[in-house]
UniProtKB/Swiss-Prot annotation:
This is Sodium-dependent phosphate transporter 1-A. It is found in: Membrane. Its main location: membrane. GO terms for biological process: phosphate ion transmembrane transport. Residues 438-458, 483-513 are annotated as: Disordered. It comes from the Eukaryota. Residues 483-496 have a biased composition (Acidic residues). It comes from Xenopus laevis (African clawed frog).
Length: 685
């Protein structure tokens, strides 16, 4: 009785159906709805990363915020734009007229296509590989058609277009993204003060974003919005008009507010920390701004030492101030040495103007180069500089200009393996020797040399006094002769690898967006991501719902060539499935697109989003085969390579490309297997 009631409820929910012809196949319709939801789930878990992966990776939005925005725009886009694209998936890949007398075969084929596509997309999501949902459903559709009707029903030109898109999409989008990012970097990012040029470019960027995305949405010809009745010249006129209006609003309203906000938040307080303080003395320091007073930071059970290091800049200014920094010194493990250190005077008040000369002849100048780093007991002391302080950022800039790659000492000196990229910066601050020293009489490995205490032949000790190793360690030890170096070839390889890692890290940090630049591009990237999500919902919901639409309309009308419109509630059903997949499993591919493939900043993320959207619009109108997923991956890789040649994970990119290559055959084989089961075991036709 209960099963009969459930059957009646499902039948009534599906509407008025032609039960006289297709009633025996109602089970196929119900099964199709279940598999279609799983397919929509897999699309949400994989393809939605195209829209918000870069925004999450650049830190503009959190993963939770991205899921909320994507859920809204994906659902709205699927309802408003999805009907048009579903027609292509339903009729554009195979010749449906061959199924006029065997409608049940077409229904079974739709189920097989959805199953094959869903399985491969879920597998790719598990492996964190972004693939094209369109290519999945195309391969699956071709797979079931080969089993059902052989080669005669397949439109092979579509398969050729897919193969071409593997190369055209990432290459074309990558070139356009690279050109846009080069423009942004040349005229904004590399300027001493990027704000003026950034504000001037802001109206242009907003206008391009609005114009391109609006044209893309209107050109799809969504019948629900009436866009199918608007001529091409009307679409162009509306898009250009909205873009110009947006540019005027941004120039007269947004830019003045943005300028005031930047001046208030960044210009008046440039990246300082409570470690900095000022004294009104005559100095040259136009970059750093003073703080009210010294701040001592206690370390539990340890020693707090205050080392005041006034900083000099290379450019003289009329109004100058002395800047000092308080260095925290952690606890010494040796009780005897701790007692000695407690009695030491570590407050340095008298600056002695000095500088550190690099091997290439450049100077990094400070008003206090602490020369007496080794005390009377033969100990080197370790000082921690907070990485968020203005002092650290100023020093980072100076050392970059002085080519830190040359700071590792002369050819006869062997540098130690450094724990992280902050070591050299702290060494320069404290005036410690830039050529790392080692013990003459020991053949300890670099890892052993970095232990807390090392006894040398001359009785000197090296004590680690830094309890914050995540920031920086100033390393020093006794000299090591050349013969010992030749005996430790493995150590030399480790040092060379670490030196390259340090220079790569320095290059990456230098290429990070300044706070004011990030503020300029943040909302732009969110805007492009929302537009992309809206268009993605309209395009990729068809990958999940297209076969279901064919299945439903064949069951309802009994005609495989029906011209009935796609029901809105079917599109909404697919949109809900996409959103659930995003919330449950979308973070995996979002991490690949936004973080694992290459680091992304707001400026590079905006370049990726806008250029890939422009590529899709141009290629679609010209008739070139294109894939949104491939465009985004190509843009991410090209911009990441421009920012830092070592920042791209080429092994991951290789895996992604291999996944693209096997998408069509794997989804096709799975679909063909399910179709063979239907044809020969269940339907027996």
């Amino acid at each position: 009785m209960e099963s009969t009631t459930a059957f009646s409820a499902v039948t009534s929910a599906l509407g008025t159906l032609d039960v006289h012809i297709m009633a025996p196949y109602l089970w196929m319709l119900v099964l199709g709805f279940v598999i279609a939801f799983v397919l929509a789930f897999s699309v949400g878990a994989n393809d939605v990363a195209n829209s918000f992966g870069t925004a999450v990776g650049s830190g503009v939005v959190t993963l939770r915020q991205a899921c909320i925005l994507a859920s809204i725009f994906e659902t709205v886009g699927s309802v408003l734009l999805g009907a048009k694209v579903s027609e292509t998936i339903r009729k554009g890949l195979i010749d449906v007229t061959m199924y006029n007398s065997t409608q049940e075969l077409l229904m079974a084929g739709s189920i097989s296509a959805m199953f094959g596509s869903a399985v491969w997309q879920l597998a790719a999501s598990f492996m964190k590989l972004p693939i094209s949902g369109t290519h999945c459903i195309v391969g699956a559709t071709i797979g079931f058609s080969l089993v059902a009707k052989g080669q005669q029903g397949v439109k092979w030109i579509e398969l050729l277009r897919i193969v071409l898109s593997w190369f055209i999409s990432p290459l074309l989008s990558g070139i356009m993204s690279a050109l846009l990012f080069l423009f942004v970097r040349m005229f904004i990012l590399r300027k001493a003060d990027p704000v003026p040029n950034g504000l001037r470019a802001l109206p242009v960027f907003y206008a391009c974003t609005i114009g391109i995305n609006l044209f893309s949405i209107m050109f799809t010809g969504a019948p629900l919005l009436g866009f199918d009745k608007v001529p091409l010249w009307g679409i162009i006129l509306i898009s250009v008009g909205c873009a110009v209006l947006c540019a005027l609003i941004v120039w007269f309203v947004v830019c003045p507010r943005m300028k005031r906000k930047i001046e208030c938040e960044f210009k008046s307080s440039p990246s300082e920390s409570p470690l900095m303080d000022k004294k009104n003395q005559e100095l040259r320091c136009p970059i750093l701004k003073p703080d009210p007073e010294d701040l001592k930071l206690p370390v539990d059970g340890g020693i707090v030492a205050e080392v005041k290091v006034p900083i000099l800049d290379m450019v003289s200014v009329s109004r100058t101030e002395e800047r000092t920094v308080t260095f925290k010194m952690g606890e010494c493990d040796d009780p005897i040495e701790k007692e000695k250190l407690n009695s030491m005077e570590t407050n340095i008040d008298q600056p002695t103007n000095g500088s550190v000369q690099l091997p290439n002849g450049n100077h990094v100048q400070f008003s206090q180069a602490v020369s007496n780093q080794m005390n009377s007991s033969g100990q080197y002391q370790y000082h921690t500089v907070h990485k968020d302080s203005g002092l650290y950022k100023d020093l980072l800039h100076k050392l970059h200009l002085a080519k830190m790659g040359d700071c590792m000492g002369d050819s006869g000196d062997k540098p130690l393996r450094r724990n992280n990229s902050y070591t050299s910066y702290t060494m320069a601050i404290c005036g410690m020797p830039l050529d790392s020293l080692r013990n003459r009489d020991t053949e300890a490995r670099p890892d052993e040399a970095e232990k807390s205490t090392v006894h040398g032949a001359d009785g000197k000790k090296r004590i680690r006094m830094d309890s914050y190793t995540s920031y920086c360690n100033a390393v020093a030890d006794t000299h090591m002769d050349v013969e010992a170096e030749e005996q430790e070839e493995g150590s030399v390889e480790d040092v060379e690898t670490d030196r390259k890692s340090s220079s790569s890290s320095l290059e990456e940090r230098h290429d990070q967006d300044k706070p004011e630049v990030s503020l300029l591009f943040q909302f732009l990237q969110i805007l492009t991501a929302c537009f992309g999500s809206f268009a993605h919902g309209g395009n990729d919901v068809s990958n999940a719902i297209g076969p279901l639409v064919a299945l439903y309309l064949v069951y309802e009308t009994g005609d495989v060539t029906t011209k009935a419109a796609t029901p809105i509630w079917l599109l909404l059903y697919g949109g809900i499935g996409i959103c659930i997949g995003l919330w449950v499993w979308g973070r995996r591919v979002i991490q690949t697109m936004g973080k694992d493939l290459t680091p992304i900043t707001p400026s590079s993320g905006f370049s990726i989003e806008l250029a890939s959207a422009l590529t899709v619009v141009i290629a679609s109108n010209v008739g070139l085969p294109i894939s949104t997923t491939h465009c985004k991956v190509g843009s991410v890789v090209s911009v990441g390579w421009l920012r830092s040649k070592k920042a791209v994970d080429w092994r991951l990119f290789r895996n992604i490309f291999l996944a693209w290559f096997v998408t069509v055959p794997i989804s096709g084989l799975i679909s063909a297997g399910i179709m063979a089961l239907f044809k020969y075991a269940i339907l027996k036709v």
